Amino acid sequence: MKVVILGAGVIGVTSAWYLARAGHEVVVVDRQDGPALETSFANAGEISPGYASPWAAPGIPAKALRWLFMRHAPLIVRPGFDPAMVRWLVAMLGNCTARAYRVNKGRMVRLAEFSRDRLIELRQETGIRYDERSQGTLQLFRREKDLAGVAKDIEVLKADGVPFELLDAAGCIAAEPGLANSASPIAGGLRLPNDETGDCFKFTNALAELAKAEGVRFVLGRRIDAIVASGNRIAHVRTDRGDISGDAYLVALGSHSPLLLSPLGIRLPVYPVKGYSITVPIVDPARAPVSTLLDESFKVAITRLGDRIRVGGMAEISGYSNDLPPARRATLDHCVGSLFPDAGDLSQASFWTGLRPMTPDGTPVIGATGYRNLFLNTGHGTLGWTMACGSGHVIADIIGGKRPAIETGDLAIDRY
């Protein structure tokens, strides 16, 4: 079967890999000149199944109101009349209940843990390298009142069987020795030892090369203008340089997926939630993080990637804007500078933004559509890197008519 994949980010490329390994002819189409040049380019670098949680949770509406007035706010909303934004926000608020949170988190953890296992398997099989580390994630609490609220998180971790360590300040410094130099107080932390880190851009490009060796063809620098249907099937994809046809089609275009699906009558509830990152060259390795640290106060991740520190996070709801406000950069500088002072040269840091494809319930949309040969693998939000290998594996099974190794029925678009 010839499968045409739209999107060469980490989701599209992992899907291509598993489809090719299953014996399919695969073509990947993307408007960029290389893989992983949009949302997969400079994300936070964490692979954290244990922290796979929906943003829609009990108490979030009240927290969001407080965040809007903070100087270094983890959430920014730029209001405007965008019906898609309004629908998305209303649907997200509808998921901020205890029952919905449990259901959605269960789906996310299931896929994230399956994905981590597939990543380990892929690494062992191919020897792929991407500045990877397997040294866990530390969720750091600067304030005692935030640490006191971790009991609910621990209950969820216990229920899901996720290993964890509750640490005091000394324990946090033992896990991340660079914190001994912190200019900020440390109340304690929650460490998940089974989490990993790695450079998503390096991984995606390395896997693309391996996929080419399996026969995958990349058609890059092509703007995708439309998905053209004939009856209940997709006939071809229209690009700015001609049509591309196949037997099956997979949409893995992240936040841009709804724009191409809407003319087909498919309302995909995915909306872009903007994130920011800086990548800082390390000047003192002893002061730098060892793995990934999640700064609970600012909702920012600080990750060691080889000789660099990646600092990423925040959430801005502002449509498809790609501007880079200095205030967002200042927040990232403050986070890493206060916890790991003099570890990196902030004057040489690169500043980046990406549009995360978020669903109202936090769970990606993976599976078939009402068109017999059109499939979706999108809407992973902040967890595209964490869920990539698992998502690629299950969609390859679904397209190939095989039963996936995990339950995927509740990931399909018909849940909406």
From Swiss-Prot:
Q: Which reaction does it catalyse?
A: a D-alpha-amino acid + A + H2O = a 2-oxocarboxylate + AH2 + NH4(+)
A single GO molecular function term of this UniProt record? D-amino-acid dehydrogenase activity
Q: What is its EC number?
A: 1.4.99.-
Question: Residues that bind FAD, according to the entry?
Answer: 3-17
Keyword vocabulary terms for this entry: FAD, Flavoprotein, Oxidoreductase
Q: Which domain of life is it from?
A: Bacteria
**Record carries keyword Flavoprotein:** yes
Family annotation (SUPFAM superfamilies): FAD-linked reductases, C-terminal domain (SSF54373), FAD/NAD(P)-binding domain (SSF51905)
Q: Does the keyword Oxidoreductase apply?
A: yes
Cofactor(s) named in the record: FAD
Instruction: State the Gene Ontology BP annotations.
Output: D-alanine catabolic process
Q: Which Pfam families match?
A: DAO
Hey, which pathway is this one from? Amino-acid degradation; D-alanine degradation; NH(3) and pyruvate from D-alanine: step 1/1
Q: Name one GO cellular component term.
A: cytoplasm
Chain coiled-coil ranges: none
The record's NCBIfam families line, in alphabetical order, gives: PRK00711.1
Task performed by this protein: Oxidative deamination of D-amino acids.
Q: Which family does it belong to?
A: Belongs to the DadA oxidoreductase family.
Protein name stated in the entry? D-amino acid dehydrogenase
